[in-house]
């Protein structure tokens, strides 16, 4: 995990330095303060859960390091609307280019197309990125505990909270959980993917969930493909899920999203080629 994150940090630091040369922090901060108000990411999830529904953070994701291109027919606004029609509570949009072929413009387009709160899914190493995220309309950022020391995580979280944003604290093990619990953000995501092998297992969430206080919003991430997976994680108190790849591969994203969120469902939606179109009913 450390080797992968070290390589990622190296290119992100270069990106950040380049961005700062192109646009000063004061300029970006002015844009952030002028941006439309945050939509309340955690608030929206809690409202969804209070109504008795699952809360889905649906991901707009073109590619990944482990799977390569996921969807050739990639149109962020259409995908965002399809997710919203299917019952998603929030959106997650990849903005990292080297590893995920993402872009900040994709996040802007997805947010503009819907009324849903949006997470900027990227590797955060500098508070500049947080301000940049808000300037582009992000309602939430990702903090990967494995990538940051405690001081950096605290600074990045503070920058987000000061701008009215939420933060998703991502963990992979008990040590990272203990560190995350010292921060202020109530939303903790358990990533079921082993960053060394890229293998996923829901057992990671099942093992860590009992150690997460019940007043926190627990999010299951990675390795979630069917309604049965949601039902399995619900048994350990996880009712919020971040799902990308399995939905991005569907021809009818809206129908696939509805099927995933249907309680009592046991079958996985039919997987179709990644270049299939997006169709809304």
From Swiss-Prot:
EC number: 4.1.1.48
GO biological process: L-tryptophan biosynthetic process
Catalytic activity line of the entry: 1-(2-carboxyphenylamino)-1-deoxy-D-ribulose 5-phosphate + H(+) = (1S,2R)-1-C-(indol-3-yl)glycerol 3-phosphate + CO2 + H2O
CDD domains membership: IGPS
Keywords: Amino-acid biosynthesis, Aromatic amino acid biosynthesis, Decarboxylase, Lyase, Tryptophan biosynthesis
Classification via InterPro entries: Aldolase_TIM (IPR013785), Indole-3-glycerol_P_synth (IPR045186), Indole-3-glycerol_P_synth_dom (IPR013798), Indole-3-GlycerolPSynthase_CS (IPR001468), RibuloseP-bd_barrel (IPR011060)
A single MF term (Gene Ontology): indole-3-glycerol-phosphate synthase activity
Protein name: Indole-3-glycerol phosphate synthase
Organism of derivation: Nitrobacter hamburgensis (strain DSM 10229 / NCIMB 13809 / X14)
Name of the encoding gene: trpC
């Amino acid at each position: 995990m450390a080797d992968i994150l070290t390589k990622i940090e190296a290119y992100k630091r270069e990106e950040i330095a380049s961005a700062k040369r192109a646009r000063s922090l004061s300029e970006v901060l002015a844009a952030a303060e002028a941006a439309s108000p945050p939509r309340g990411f955690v608030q929206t999830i809690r409202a969804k859960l209070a109504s008795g529904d699952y809360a889905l953070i649906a991901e707009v994701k073109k590619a990944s390091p482990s799977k390569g291109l996921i969807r050739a027919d990639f149109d962020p606004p259409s995908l965002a609307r399809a997710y919203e029609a299917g019952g998603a509570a929030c959106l997650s949009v990849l903005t990292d280019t080297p590893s995920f072929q993402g872009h900040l413009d994709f996040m802007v387009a997805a947010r503009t197309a819907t009324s849903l709160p949006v997470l900027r899914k990227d590797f955060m190493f500098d508070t500049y990125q947080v301000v940049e995220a808000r300037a582009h309309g992000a309602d939430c950022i990702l903090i990967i505990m494995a990538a940051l020391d405690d001081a950096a995580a605290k600074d990045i979280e503070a920058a987000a909270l000061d701008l009215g944003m939420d933060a998703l604290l991502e963990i992979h093990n008990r040590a990272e959980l203990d560190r995350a619990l010292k921060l202020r953000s109530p939303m903790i995501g358990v990533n079921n993917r082993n960053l060394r092998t890229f293998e996923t297992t829901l057992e990671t969430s099942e093992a860590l969930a009992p150690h997460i206080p019940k007043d926190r919003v627990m999010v299951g991430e990675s390795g979630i493909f069917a309604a049965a997976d949601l039902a399995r994680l619900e048994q350990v108190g996880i009712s919020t899920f971040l799902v990308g790849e399995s939905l991005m591969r569907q021809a009818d994203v809206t129908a696939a999203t509805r099927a995933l969120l249907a309680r009592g469902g046991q079958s996985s939606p039919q997987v179709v080629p990644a270049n299939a179109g997006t169709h809304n009913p």
